[in-house]
Amino acid sequence: MLKKVLIKGPVLSRSGYGEQARFALRALQSRPDLFDIYIVNIPWGRTGQISSVDEEANVIHETLLKTQTYVHQKGQFDISLQVTVPNEFEKIAPINIGYTAAIETTKVSPQWIAKANETVDRIIVVSDHSKKVFEQTKYDVKDQNGNEHKNWGLQVPVETVNYPVRVFEPEEVNIDFRTSKNFRHRRS
């Protein structure tokens, strides 16, 4: 039986997170024998939207419509893959995976750790540095009852999935540098 996977992220955005969401979409689409894919597009700041009219854009728009129909019929998802920052993670399905670029600094905010611990079963990051920072960030905290907890940190596994880079072949450009108009030395 196919797993119903919801990708929630800025799939239509011209941004790094948009590229990340489309990368995840392509990866899941490569296994139609395993996954029935649904999409919820979220806004991403003031970034523009993809404007290409190609096969991928058509599939995204068709999947968005399929998702609206499925949600309207009260359909449930088996897995959610949430491509966003950790403070926006939610419990959507029985299995929830946060997929984030995270941060390139030395410590994760306690709010991100708390939200991840409460809502997702696993986190995927795009760099080994982010993984290390998530795993090594610890805080001394007090719970609602006043009990102190030392070295409190992330309680869910973190995996690194590196970002693919498109390889472009440069086009040959024929330029005639012989000219009498450009780069001419003028006398005063």
Language model feature labels by segment:
Residues 6-8, 46-133:
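Extended catalytic core of nucleotide-activated donor transferases of GT-like folds
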Residues 39-56, 148-152:
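Helix-enriched interaction subdomains in cytosolic or periplasmic regions
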Residues 1-45:
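N-terminal subdomain of nucleotide-sugar transferases
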Residues 4, 187-188:
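Residues that mark the start of a beta-strand
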Residues 121-186:
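Donor nucleotide-sugar binding/catalytic pocket of nucleotide-sugar-dependent glycosyltransferases
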Residues 22-24, 54-56, 97-98, 138-143, ...:
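Short secondary-structure boundary/capping segments
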